[in-house]
UniProtKB/Swiss-Prot annotation:
Family recorded in the similarity comment: Belongs to the GcvT family. CAF17/IBA57 subfamily.
Transit peptide location on this chain: 1-43
Entry annotated with the keyword NAD: no
Lineage: Eukaryota, Fungi, Dikarya, Ascomycota, Saccharomycotina
Gene Ontology MF, one: transferase activity
Isomerase in keyword set: no
GO cellular-component term (any): mitochondrial matrix
Protein name: Iron-sulfur cluster assembly factor IBA57 homolog, mitochondrial
The species this protein was found in: Debaryomyces hansenii (strain ATCC 36239 / CBS 767 / BCRC 21394 / JCM 1990 / NBRC 0083 / IGC 2968)
């Protein structure tokens, strides 16, 4: 099955507003992204000119103003930090360094073209966009750490989150142009001017809807993966909604087809096809680390921001330079010669909602996924046979030999049609990409289903 080349869809998201004089400090202490302009070197024993390049950020950014957000990529060799008004990917962690939820963070408002949002730009204001299933959990975390901070925490129900993508080479180049032209500012004044120019230029949106566009982000978790836009009105065909044709500018429509409105499932399927995991994909009781969720590869982590909740384990892992497990995409298949031959030649995930293997998976409850054993489909022939157990001379010893369970090669986290995600040992998948899982059968015994592990092509080359 192929999803449409382009499309736009509403997302099941909640938006929390953090507003007040201490909003910048407050979020800096809780999220994995940098909000304060001071630099805390990730390796104190080194002297690196690149790490000192932004020492004057504290002179440029006044944290008591509505100044924007800092965008950075920890793997950028130039160590660029851009001050921008558009949103970015981030996470909130527990005190033990485990992921509470991933999110997108926005400065509010995104723009102030013609003074449209003049009344809202007087003090630091941010929006946190999360999957709706994590709203209560994140609210509790924020309120727990609020203490005497001068911030208000409010759920915003009047905004709607939309995701647009276009999987053509032309749009990929178009997004490169947009970012180069409007989103490389290094101070708050330029950031706001560029955001205003972006709306006014009609390069993407209809400027007549400037007052309806409350937030904007380029999704660079995967380079140029799509765009996100926060609206104060719904998009659709009903009389009280904004027609999708009206959202985009004339110049945009001269170059690209007006997208069809898709269901959120299409956005989810596209993520699975591209190996992009989100917190809600795994069971609620999952306990994951940010590096396991590839946060460092999706532009959601700052290493020079100082202390924040969950920071100690995260920075220690980075400094040790050893990441043993990561979440990787997989494709399920029925184990037979035809499938093995086809998958042996396949370099990309193939979504097929009609794959017969789905019948074997559909009755699995999410809480049982991580308990399923994953082992190599073909055992290594050169593996030495297990040594026989030494018989104890004790008369009280158990004479029955003990069967030692082989260690599972990973943990199954989620299933979408015939695709899914596994938390895998990187050392295992370097050498083996075909595995099997044991599924319990109602008739008794077990049934095996095949898994092929894929390393996303957007991962950096080792």
């Amino acid at each position: 099955m192929k999803i449409p080349v382009s499309g736009i869809s509403a997302l099941n998201r909640s938006l929390l507003q953090i507003k007040g004089p201490d909003a910048t400090k407050f979020l800096n202490g809780l999220s994995t992204s940098r909000f304060l302009p001071n630099i805390v070197k990730k390796k104190q024993h080194t002297i690196d000119e690149a790490e000192n390049r932004h020492a004057k950020l504290s002179e440029i950014i006044n944290i008591n103003d509505n100044w924007g957000l800092m965008h950075e990529d920890i793997y950028d060799p130039d160590n660029n930090i851009f001050v921008r008004r558009d949103g970015l990917n981030s996470m909130f962690l527990s005190s033990k360094g485990r992921v509470v939820t991933d999110c997108f963070l926005y400065s509010q408002p995104f723009h102030n073209l013609n003074g449209t949002f003049e009344g809202q730009i007087s003090e630091p204001t941010y929006l946190i966009e999360i999957d709706s299933s994590f709203t209560s959990q994140l609210q509790m975390l924020l309120k727990l750490h609020k203490l005497s901070a001068k911030v208000s925490i409010e759920t915003i129900k009047s905004m709607h989150s939309y995701y647009y993508y276009n999987d053509t080479a032309e749009f990929d180049e178009y997004l490169d142009f947009i970012q180069q032209e409007f989103f490389r500012s290094r101070d708050p004044v330029d950031a706001l001017n560029n955001a205003n120019s972006f709306i006014k230029s009609e390069v993407l949106f209809n400027p007549k809807l400037a007052g309806n566009i409350l937030g904007f982000s380029i999704d660079n978790r995967i380079p140029n993966f799509g765009i996100k836009v926060l609206m104060d009105k719904e998009i659709g065909d009903d009389d009280n909604k904004i027609p999708v044709d009206d959202l985009f500018s004339s110049s945009f429509k001269d170059n690209f087809v007006v997208p069809e409105i898709l269901k959120p499932e299409s956005i989810t399927r596209r993520r699975f096809m591209n190996g992009l995991f989100e917190t809600q994909d795994s069971p609620k009781e999952s306990s994951l680390l940010p590096f396991e969720m590839n946060l460092d590869l999706t532009n959601g982590l700052s290493l020079e921001k100082g202390c924040y909740v969950g920071q100690e384990l995260t920075i220690r892992t980075y400094n040790n330079g050893i990441i043993r497990k990561r979440i990787v995409p997989i494709q399920f298949f029925e184990i037979n010669d035809d499938n093995l031959s086809a998958l042996d030649e396949s370099e990309y995930l193939t979504l097929d909602p009609n794959d017969p293997v789905i019948r074997e998976l559909q009755d699995l409850h999410s809480s049982t996924l991580s308990k399923l054993e994953i082992t190599p489909l073909i055992e290594k022939k050169d593996s030495p046979p297990p040594e026989p157990e030494q018989q104890s001379s004790s008369p009280f010893a158990n004479s029955k030999p003990v069967r030692r369970r082989t260690a599972s090669s990973g943990k199954l986290l989620s299933i979408q049609d015939n695709l899914g995600f596994v938390l895998a040992n990187l050392s295992d998948i370097e050498n083996v990409d075909l595995y099997k899982i044991e599924l319990p059968c109602l008739e008794g015994g077990v049934k095996h289903v095949g898994i092929k592990v894929f390393k996303p092509e957007w991962w950096p080359i080792d």
